[in-house]
């Protein structure tokens, strides 16, 4: 500290004024770039976020009557025929239905040998469509690992049990 004071006193009055002016400019620049500018940038981001959130809130308020209206509507009352659902999902999962025979509220099916994973995915899709598996018996196909022959498959609608 003593060395800095000695250096300061060795300078002429003009050099001291220039050094003080440079220190003030440096201090102003430092305050501007470390405090003021980041604050302004954050404030602009906050304003944008606030505007976006207010727009979202306004949109949500506009959608409230529509949501209430849709909530009060009843779902369509014409469910698909079970055979239509079964055939559509079988085609989607790559299975071939050989025979589909109604037995009261149940359906007996004959399916060509198929990949076990595809069969399970198909039965899961039918379950999501409201069909349950009443009876299922399969045997492995000896020449094709992962393939099964469906010996017995009886399906029924979940709401008709």
Swiss-Prot record:
Topological type in the membrane: Single-pass membrane protein
Regions of this protein lying in the Cytoplasmic compartment: 1-16
Residue intervals passing through the bilayer: 17-36
InterPro entries: T2SS_GspM (IPR007690), T2SS_M_periplasmic_sf (IPR023229)
Entry coiled-coil feature ranges: none
Keyword GTP-binding assigned: no
Family of this protein: Belongs to the GSP M family.
Name this protein carries in UniProt: Type II secretion system protein M
């Amino acid at each position: 500290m003593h060395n800095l004071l000695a250096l300061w006193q060795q300078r002429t009055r003009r050099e001291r004024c220039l050094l003080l002016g440079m220190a003030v400019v440096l201090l102003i620049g430092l305050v501007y770039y470390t405090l003021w500018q980041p604050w302004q940038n954050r404030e602009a981001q906050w304003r944008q976020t606030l505007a976006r959130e207010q727009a979202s809130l306004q949109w949500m308020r506009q959608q409230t009557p529509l949501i209430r209206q849709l909530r009060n509507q009843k779902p369509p009352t014409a469910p698909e025929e079970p055979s239509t659902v079964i055939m559509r999902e079988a085609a989607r999962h790559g299975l071939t239905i050989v025979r589909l025979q109604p037995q009261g509220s149940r359906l007996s099916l004959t399916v060509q040998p198929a990949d076990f994973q595809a069969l399970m995915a198909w039965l899961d899709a039918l379950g999501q469509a409201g069909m349950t598996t009443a009876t299922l018996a399969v045997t492995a196909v000896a020449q094709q690992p992962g393939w099964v022959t469906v010996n017995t498959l009886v399906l029924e609608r979940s709401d008709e049990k």
